[in-house]
């Protein structure tokens, strides 16, 4: 993103705001707050070109990290399970709605396939896909199963957190 010194036009500010909405989830709040602070300073006549340039660099960095996460999504293979027959429909619903409730028989693949369906529609690129389990052993078992299906090692794209035990990395989805 190119921000020219001394020219913080409404169009450039609008571009910054738009780009912030595309950043990593964990960065959005802080970037928006920093932009608001800079705009407030600008209204008070305390223009600081260097701070606008630094903000633009932070936004670019966050966008690059998000692109790297997108590029690191492993190849997704869906085994022959009942939920796999409806994966396109479920993916479309996940893309269109903030909340989707999926009901199915035990063993239909909900637990292991829904996170992969979420990955297939780009979820997990701006932040983590959370998957809760009622017991510690279940959390480890589910994570191991998904890792096995993706052909990776624990902690790469898939990890788990149980109390103080963290098996995730920066690039975990």
Language model features: what each stretch is:
Residues 1-96:
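Intrinsically disordered, low-complexity N-terminal segments enriched in charged residues and glycine
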Residues 93, 98-173:
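Conserved P-loop/Walker A NTP-binding site and adjacent catalytic elements of P-loop NTPases
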């Amino acid at each position: 993103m190119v921000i020219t010194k001394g020219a913080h036009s409404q169009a450039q500010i609008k571009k910054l705001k738009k780009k912030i909405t595309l950043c990593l989830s964990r960065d959005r709040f802080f970037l928006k707050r920093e932009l608001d602070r800079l705009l407030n300073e600008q209204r008070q006549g305390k223009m600081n070109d260097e701070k606008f340039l630094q903000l633009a660099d932070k936004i670019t960095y966050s966008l690059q990290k998000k692109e790297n996460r997108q590029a690191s999504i492993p190849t997704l293979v869906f085994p022959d399970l009942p939920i796999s027959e409806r994966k396109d429909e479920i993916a479309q619903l996940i893309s269109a709605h903030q909340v989707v409730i999926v009901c199915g028989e035990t063993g239909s693949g909900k637990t292991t396939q829904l996170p992969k369906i979420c990955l297939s529609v780009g979820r997990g690129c701006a932040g983590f896909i959370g998957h809760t389990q009622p017991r510690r052993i279940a959390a480890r078992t589910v994570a191991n199963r998904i890792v096995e299906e993706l052909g990776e090692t624990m902690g790469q794209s898939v990890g788990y957190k149980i109390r103080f035990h963290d098996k995730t990395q920066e690039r975990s989805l």
